[in-house]
Structures are given as structure tokens and as C-alpha cells.
Amino acid sequence: MFFYPLDHVAVAVTSLEEARSVFQLLTGDTCSTPEVLESQGVRVQFIGSLELLEPLGPESTVGRFLARRGPGLHHIAYRVPNLPQALARLKAEGVRLIDDVPRPGARGHMVAFVHPRSSEGILVELVESEAPVTS
């Protein structure tokens, strides 16, 4: 059996600046430099192992999420050493995937998402990384 360590928890926010100030006070962690992921329509910033997601527009995935649900938990992410292998194993076990093939994500890592219908309603991201990820 394989177990993957938790990489980060992501929160959808309407404003990185406003959310950053609150979460930095709560955690005391330092913030990464904000990063724009055009392909995903989002601006991200890490505070320790918390990822803040701000949509670039209302039609982005995170923009639609905010319109439907408001700010809050967006996904949890697990670190995997070999993403294609992890995806193949999950698919063979009948897990429904959003991404059959890894794609570029934040911090230069390749990522893929598991459909919430296969994970008790929670969007799960897999992040390819051997080492612990830091902001």
C-alpha cells in the first residue's frame, strides 16, 4: 500500500492581499512571492503549507468556484515522487481523475487532480516532488 504525505491545503480567496494578512498573522509563516499561472487562470501565494488561490477572472476555475461557494477550502494536495506512476495506479484502482496527464503547477512542479467524486467530495491535487516542499 502507498501513502503520500500532505503537501499543502489550498484556499480560494477573492484577494491575495487581504487573505495573506490574516493567514500570516495566524501562522507566523513567511509568504512566497505571488505566482501567476495563466494556464489555470489563477494567482497563487504560499504561506508555509497553505496555498492561497485568487482567480484572474470570473470564468477561471477558481472564479467559478468562488461564485458558487464563496471563499474557503478549495483542495488538499499530496506529494508523490512519480506522478505518472501514481496516476496509473489510481486509474487502475478505478479512481476518477480530472487529469490523466500531469500538467505544470505552482512552484515549478507537475501536478494532476483527482475528481471530488472519487474522494468524498474533496478536490485532491497530486504534486510531483521528492523532497519536502517549502515556500
Q: Model features per residue range: what roles?
A:
Residues 1, 7, 19, 24, ...:
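A cross-kingdom feature marking solvent-exposed beta-strand/loop segments within repeated
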